[in-house]
Amino acid sequence: YKIFVAEVASTSDEALLIHYLLDQSKDDKETAYLLNYFLEQFRTTLFRQTMFAEFEKIAHAKSEAGEPLTAEVLCNIYYDLNKKYFGDEIVVDKEIALEWSRIPHFYTPFYVYQYSTGFSAAIAISSKILNGEAGIVEKYKKFLSGGSSLDCIDLLKICDVDMTTKEPVEEALKVFENTL
């Protein structure tokens, strides 16, 4: 099976587990921890991995245009993206410009997007399950057993998640907002 399918499966199950643990929690500190953990998954997976993908896209475009990719150029791209993604309300330290150089994901070009898109698909599936959508558990099991039998996009359509639309990302952002 492909990494994307594995990411969707593991993240869907993790989201279901987090909701179960939140429902069972009787302790405010535990609840706060679980909520923080879940929200951090959105920040680090949906948001940050998208920023990584944009960094990659810009760097490759510059390379293909014949522009030299020096450490300074890459640091400037990365710093500017941090400013763009985090906005004016967050202080973005100059040192963040160097972070790109320690991210091993960039050794394999154009795969980080799978984390953010897989996360969106997983949140869409787990939301359907948590909301009691008719037939979704059976569809999810069929998705899980699909392995590599279909293209990832077609496998997700088994669960009525269409990654060719913005709907899964919008659902993930709605879950994030509701969790906040």
Question: Whereabouts are the PLM-identified features?
Answer:
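C-terminal, non-catalytic "cap/extension" segments appended to globular domains
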Residues: 4, 12-15, 23-29, 49, ...
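Zinc-dependent metallopeptidase catalytic helix centered on the HExxH motif
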Residues: 1-20, 28-43
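Solvent-exposed, amphipathic alpha-helical "stalk/arm" or coiled-coil-like segments used as scaffolds
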Residues: 36, 40-48, 52, 56
